[in-house]
Amino acid sequence: PLVLAAAHIAGVDEIYRMGGAQAIAALAYGTATIVAVDKIVGPGNAYVATAKRHVFGTVGIDMIAGPSEILVLADKNNNPSWIAADLLSQAEHDVAAQSILVTDDEIFADQVVAAVAEQLPTLAKGDIATASWDRYGSVIVVQNWDEAVDLVDRIAPEHLAIALNDRDSEAMLERVRNAGSIFLGAHTPEPIGDYIAGPNHVLPTARGARFSSGLSVLDFMKRSSIIRCDAPGLAHLGPDAVILAEAEGLSAHARAISLRLNQSNPKTD
């Protein structure tokens, strides 16, 4: 009911109760009751991601979104329980989710690990979070924050939380290149971006932030190039285009231009 209410407020006029890889196939190819669409967006499990990969080309897709990820940069001035909760906020999504702490203080790292162990039994999805943390959770202690910049850009996390002082957070923000969404400061937990901050939280995973961005209105837009030459314009550009076409061995390309340069059109002249 909550999703239906939100859809009504947003002006959605068509809803299908379905999910999984079979829903992706139905949307891509159409059925007796579903008209095939042009583009499919949104995350899902491994089966949905695989299905989107298969139908790409028949329809457009936004991205191949995998299990959730978070990388937290935190110094010793943070509350270890807060940082532990940040890590577990992604671990509870999926047993394949990955939560990474990067800090410059070993004692603080141990405190966060202890806080994670304390919080895990209290979670509604504790079994999932425990499996995720045991398999893919990581704590990395760096000598300095310069090392952290390189790590972040190599990992290219879906979510990057920078829990440093204001000056260092801003400095880190200026240097980091690869992250799906960035959360600045100790009072900006990742879930605030999931639910209410504003930016879309459908984000690139599996290092996809190296070359792509989160879902936005731009994913629902496309562009067409519009080109018009008058006779003087073609006279200016045409000779160089002919040279390029001939260099490629595409004589029909060259002729389409040169005929217009060298012959008049009796129907318009």
Where are these predicted regions, by residue range?
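C-terminal core of ALDH-fold dehydrogenases
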Residues: 145, 154-269
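A conserved active-site cap/scaffold subdomain adjacent to cofactor or substrate pockets
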Residues: 63-135, 139
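Structural motif
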Residues: 13-16, 37-41, 45-47, 62, ...
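Conserved NAD(P)+-binding/catalytic subdomain of aldehyde/semialdehyde dehydrogenases
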Residues: 9-98
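Glycine-rich, Lys/Arg-enriched anion-binding loops that position phosphate/diphosphate groups
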Residues: 120-155, 159-161, 165
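Active-site-proximal loop->helix
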Residues: 1-10
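Glycine-rich, charged/polar anion/phosphate-binding loops
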Residues: 55-59, 83-88, 145-147, 167-170, ...
